[in-house]
Amino acid sequence: MTRQIPLLALSWLELIFFSCYYGGLAGLGYHSLWRIALRRRNVAPAIKSVLQTGRFADGTPLTRRYTNLEFLDKKLVPAVIFYDGLLTGACPLYRLLLVDIHSTMQAMALCMLVSTRSKSLSTISLLLPTFWNVFNQFYGAAFVYPLYLLLEAVTTGFNPLYPVETETSRSALLVSAMIGSFLPFTFLWPAFLRSGTESRQRAIALYRFAPVVFSLLQIVGEKVLGAQMIPQPTSQASPYLVAGCAATVGHWYALGGALGLAMRLSHRKGRLGALTLVLKRLYLPRSAEETTRLDASVLARAAHEFLQYDVLVLIAAYIPYAYYLLAPLNLASPFAMVVSLVLGTIFLGPGAVLAFAYRVRWHLAISD
């Protein structure tokens, strides 16, 4: 039995609004990532120096071989240069933001996968979420995800997705959500454990293949394991719940780490002042701070700022999208819903809010 919920068909005015908003947000994201974060603080000379000398400013060697395929390895070097300074453990704030943003992006990857599977069960259709996730790997979430949400808004009109037709596919989605939640740690582990330079940089490089691995998880679940070997989901929306919970854990880890750092500084600035300072350094780009020399922290600080812009743009993208997913359910007044989504973003994280919004919309729209 299906609960009848009024469908939200977008008017021309709404189409224009979403096109302008998410198109503009994508443009702002691209500008923030590639024209601000990576175009100052002597970032370009620092990258050029690493490429020419094969060493970072602190003397760390640059590994250039990851797959033994020269043409492919050349494409992976920029990611290694970008992330290496964030994973050395030099600054705990880097680790906290890495966990937060990558758990958020993994939740989005799951939302893309479920959306694709609800529309088509063909194996070839999995190229679509793979494309979007690879696109994100190379151009940044602040640019790519608003474009994806714009496309989803235009094509689905915020209507509930159709249920995935087969039990095998539904069960495989649940397994993909559970295993996929750990995918970011295949490259984040050097931030937690002592590792050699080569191991750390190879982990960074090979994580570029995570989108392909994530899609392969779904294929393996559907084609190889079989429905009888996979736990049956209790709800069509269970994968969203898993992804949202994983994103929440990542966000709570970042907030808990920030609170711990603030406690160490509280004797100098007071508890509230210390917490405010740590959260600003964790999430807000320090646009006024410029670097005038090529020191070892130039690239790491630029990469951290890059991820900070990712977080801010994703918040601006996810809150209105989640609102329009939930609005037809009439769960609360518009004002109360907006306040709830903002508070949810603060305390659960943007990735969790979007995944949970999808879950609530689908769970209430489709009776299992």
From Swiss-Prot:
It is a multi-pass membrane protein. Keywords: Isomerase, Membrane, Transmembrane, Transmembrane helix. The keyword Transmembrane helix applies. Its EC number is 5.4.99.-. It comes from the Eukaryota. It is an enzyme of class 5 (isomerase). It is found in: Membrane. Coiled coil: none annotated. Pathway: Polyketide biosynthesis. One of its GO terms (molecular function) is isomerase activity. The chain crosses the membrane at residues 5-25, 79-99, 138-158, 173-193, 210-230, 241-261, 311-331, 335-355. GO terms for cellular component: membrane. Disruption phenotype: Strongly diminishes the production of asperlin. Its main location: membrane. Induction: Expression is controlled by the asperlin biosynthesis cluster-specific transcription factor alnR. Part of the gene cluster that mediates the biosynthesis of asperlin, a polyketide showing anti-inflammatory, antitumor and antibiotic activities. The first step of the asperlin biosynthesis is the production of the intermediate 2,4,6-octatrienoic acid by the highly redusing polyketide synthase alnA with cleavage of the PKS product by the esterase alnB. 2,4,6-octatrienoic acid is further converted to asperlin via several steps involving the remaining enzymes from the cluster. Belongs to the membrane-bound ascI terpene cyclase family. This is Terpene cyclase alnG. The lineage of its organism: Eukaryota, Fungi, Dikarya, Ascomycota, Pezizomycotina.
